[in-house]
């Protein structure tokens, strides 16, 4: 029929991707907001480590000194494939279903489009949660472990600002000094990573120990020493705002969002309970997407420079109609050592 609608045509699938509601993910959206798509399967990125070298004094008759290009390293990465699929039933909604009101105001293609969008949202939600997990892994370890069917590798970004408090220096123990730690760590990042870390994100146990620390409570009670204020309040998406410290100049947050670990089927926090992350609130790391490719039913290869590719295909024995999402994301902290992570308890 000339007017028959095929909801699986690329233009309809692309519209489903475009109109889908966005999931809000704190770590991914806040710190990896520099989104770029690439026309290649590999992504080449300049990893920057700055310095504080000063310009030299020179005699007027000698002339200027040539400044050597330094401080960055170009690395090539192959973004991992994320490729969830679902058996779609959206095409069934093009026909009136048994028991459906024949006077329903919705057109068949509208019902089918709604079902298609629901199915895409399910795939997109899973993919977005994986990207949030990737952001957490990169920020808390400086690495990304890519492990799945047929793939097992570690992408290391060369991150070195890692602290591990031991023995009585751990928070909650006799020699603990959370306030002093934050002051020292901020200075460390300023000197080694050339960044102003004005935001602290704590795991649940770390946050509880920080808020209960006797030195912190004592400093807050000193009327002539305005160190800051703690006024906890819950925000959306598992985020809690605890307050602000004027010295060392940081806002303190807790992040309680969890994920289902598919390796052991247990629920785990994205920010480990015993960990603290100090990071610039203005961090603008890269969220890169490699080229998507697929083979169609006519055995022709297609490519797309996009963050999400949605397509359908048919398999037989048994006959099934699949809806598939493809993406090649890689979250890249291109300004290495501009943040710090610490295991505090």
What residue spans do the PLM features occupy?
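Long, contiguous amphipathic alpha-helices that act as assembly "spine/axial" helices in icosahedral shell
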Residues: 84-159, 177, 181, 187-205, ...
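A surface/extracellular/periplasmic glyco- and lipid-processing/surface-interacting theme
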Residues: 165-180
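Assembly/oligomerization interface modules of large self-assembling protein complexes
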Residues: 34-102
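N-terminal alpha-helical "arm" segments
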Residues: 1-43, 332-345
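Ordered core of a single globular domain
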Residues: 180-239
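Extended, non-catalytic scaffold segments that flank or surround catalytic motifs
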Residues: 43, 53, 154-161
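Sequence/fold signature of self-assembling virion shell proteins
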Residues: 217-345
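A general structural signal for short secondary-structure junctions and capping/turn motifs
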Residues: 35-36, 189-194, 199, 268, ...
């Amino acid at each position: 029929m000339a007017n028959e609608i095929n909801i699986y045509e690329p233009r309809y699938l692309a519209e489903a991707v475009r109109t889908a509601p966005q999931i809000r993910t704190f770590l991914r959206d806040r710190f990896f907001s520099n989104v770029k798509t690439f026309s290649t399967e590999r992504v080449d990125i300049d990893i920057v480590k700055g310095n504080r070298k000063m310009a030299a004094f020179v005699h007027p008759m000698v002339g200027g000194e040539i400044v050597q290009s330094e401080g960055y390293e170009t690395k090539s990465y192959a973004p991992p494939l994320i490729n969830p699929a679902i058996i779609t039933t959206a095409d069934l909604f093009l026909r009136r279903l048994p028991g459906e009101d024949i006077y329903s105001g919705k057109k068949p293609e509208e019902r089918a489009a709604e079902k298609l969008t629901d199915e895409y949202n399910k795939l997109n939600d899973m993919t977005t949660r994986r990207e949030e997990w990737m952001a957490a892994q990169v920020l808390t370890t400086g690495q990304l472990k890519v492990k799945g069917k047929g793939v097992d590798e570690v992408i290391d970004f060369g991150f070195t600002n890692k602290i591990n408090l031991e023995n009585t220096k751990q928070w909650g123990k006799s020699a603990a000094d959370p306030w002093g730690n934050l002051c020292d760590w901020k200075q460390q990042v300023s000197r080694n990573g050339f960044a102003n870390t004005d935001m602290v994100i704590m795991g649940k146990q770390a946050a509880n120990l920080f808020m209960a620390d006797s030195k912190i409570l004592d400093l807050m009670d000193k009327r002539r020493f305005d160190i800051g204020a703690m006024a906890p309040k819950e925000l959306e998406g598992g985020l809690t705002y605890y307050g602000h410290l004027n010295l060392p100049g940081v806002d303190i947050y807790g992040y309680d969002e969890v994920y289902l670990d598919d390796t052991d089927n247990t629920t785990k926090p994205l920010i480990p309970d015993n960990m603290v992350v100090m990071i610039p609130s203005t961090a603008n790391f890269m969220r890169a997407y490699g080229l998507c490719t697929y083979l169609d039913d006519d055995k022709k290869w297609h490519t797309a420079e996009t963050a999400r590719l949605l397509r359908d295909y048919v398999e037989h024995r048994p006959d099934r109609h699949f809806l598939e999402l493809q993406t090649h994301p890689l979250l890249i902290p291109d300004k290495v050592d501009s943040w710090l992570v610490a295991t505090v308890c």
